[in-house]
Amino acid sequence: MNSNIFFQPFVGKDYANGGIFGKRIMILGESHYCEEECADCGDCRLHRECMDFTQHVLDDYLNENKERQNWMRTFLKFERSLVGEETNQAMRLKIWNSVVFFNYLQVAMGGPREAGTAEQYQQAGKEFFEVIEKYQPEYVIAWGKRLWNNLPNVRWQDGDDIVVDGYPVATGAYLLSNGNQVKVMAVNHPSVGYSWDYWYRVIQHFLRNS
């Protein structure tokens, strides 16, 4: 386990071979939120029990016996934009077992829609590169324009816009140490105002043509 990464990623069991997508895809969330508001959140030595936070979030979401909560709609809407249809439990498991999910900020926010500081976004870049170097995704889909605007600008190359229904969506790529490229785009954050059928068309273009 990498000690620098506080919120360890969720890694689907079929991710290595691309699962149902046939491509290695990483979903990049922005942050967890936690009501504890520990002053030393993010310190792996003091809060090892929190390092599986992301895993527990996905486990709860994928457990159909867990009571449904409002935050789960974010994952529901996004997963539909990956396959272009309403999803049932069987499809849900296939989708998330095919991807890596990682939250960018390595400290928890106090509540939903809360932003990190400029310093927190900058500091998280090191862990982000550590994760993509380890898991070698071919594609990264980031949640939200705020996160997109705060991603590292090193080892970066701008890509061509994807235009669907007249709206341009920016793309780019990171260069890994082995010479591979990781192609990146961002969707609107699926927690609010998210049209999964529109974003399905954008994502399909991204995965097929970028």
Task: Annotate the PLM regions.
Residues 115-126, 149-210:
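C-terminal capping/extension of enzyme domains
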Residues 1-135, 139, 145-147:
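A polyanion-binding, active-site-adjacent surface
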